[in-house]
Amino acid sequence: MNKKEKEIIKIILRAYDHHLIDQAAKKIIDIVSKTGVNIEGPIPLPTRKEVFTVLRSPFVNKDSREQFERRTHKRLIQIINPNKKTIESLMHISLPTAIDILLKK
């Protein structure tokens, strides 16, 4: 591998609760930084907002509606030139089940 080539692992975290996702990102950064690699992030990505509209009444009153909203927060963490110890520490990390993790190379 040349000095100019960088191997990057991208970790994308998704969750409905932004406090939970920030805690998970901090935990990942703490664990990975102990292995001595360069880290970029957490970088906040755009929040996806979904709005659901439902009728309040089961039969009449079409004008009476209720709206529900679901926001999906995302964070990006980039690990530059990871070593074997870094990847092994990522495999054994435990995060809450409410967080979706996507790893890309």
From Swiss-Prot:
InterPro entries: Ribosomal_uS10 (IPR001848), Ribosomal_uS10_CS (IPR018268), Ribosomal_uS10_dom (IPR027486), Ribosomal_uS10_dom_sf (IPR036838). GO terms for molecular function: structural constituent of ribosome; tRNA binding. One of its GO terms (biological process) is translation. SUPFAM superfamilies: Ribosomal protein S10. SMART domains: Ribosomal_S10. Keywords: Ribonucleoprotein, Ribosomal protein. It comes from the Bacteria. The keyword Ribosomal protein applies. One of its GO terms (cellular component) is ribonucleoprotein complex. Part of the 30S ribosomal subunit. Involved in the binding of tRNA to the ribosomes. This is Small ribosomal subunit protein uS10. It comes from Aster yellows witches'-broom phytoplasma (strain AYWB). The lineage of its organism: Bacteria, Bacillati, Mycoplasmatota, Mollicutes, Acholeplasmatales. The gene is rpsJ.
